[in-house]
Amino acid sequence: MPLSKEQKQEVMEKYKLHEHDTGSPEVQIAILTEKIKQLNEHLKTHQQDHASRRGLLKMVGKRRGLLNYLKSNSADRYLELIKKLGLRK
């Protein structure tokens, strides 16, 4: 269930800061958000898939850490990103 190359490229195009940007916090957070959305859909139909649920929790924790990093280094970029992604503070 990983993101396809096309999906990942689409997310990178949308959130990149410069032409060859693949590793900025914004891009990483956006990719994790897409993975989390996909995994949430999977878990709606496969409630007993505990391994995937654990992976989901790890991804959410990693995204939270990246969001905290972005918030401490650039609050305006943080606020803009959570608004774009529709995340809660």
UniProtKB/Swiss-Prot annotation:
Record-linked SUPFAM superfamilies: S15/NS1 RNA-binding domain (SSF47060)
GO molecular function: rRNA binding; structural constituent of ribosome
Chain segments carrying region Disordered: 1-22
GO cellular-component term (any): cytosolic small ribosomal subunit
Entry keyword set: Ribonucleoprotein, Ribosomal protein, RNA-binding, rRNA-binding
Top-rank taxon: Bacteria
InterPro entries found in the cross-reference section: Ribosomal_uS15, Ribosomal_uS15_bac-type, uS15_NS1_RNA-bd_sf
GO biological process: translation
Entry function: One of the primary rRNA binding proteins, it binds directly to 16S rRNA where it helps nucleate assembly of the platform of the 30S subunit by binding and bridging several RNA helices of the 16S rRNA. Forms an intersubunit bridge (bridge B4) with the 23S rRNA of the 50S subunit in the ribosome.
Family stated for the protein in its record: Belongs to the universal ribosomal protein uS15 family.
Oligomeric form and interacting partners: Part of the 30S ribosomal subunit. Forms a bridge to the 50S subunit in the 70S ribosome, contacting the 23S rRNA.
UniProt protein name: Small ribosomal subunit protein uS15
Organism listed in the record: Natranaerobius thermophilus (strain ATCC BAA-1301 / DSM 18059 / JW/NM-WN-LF)
The encoding gene: rpsO
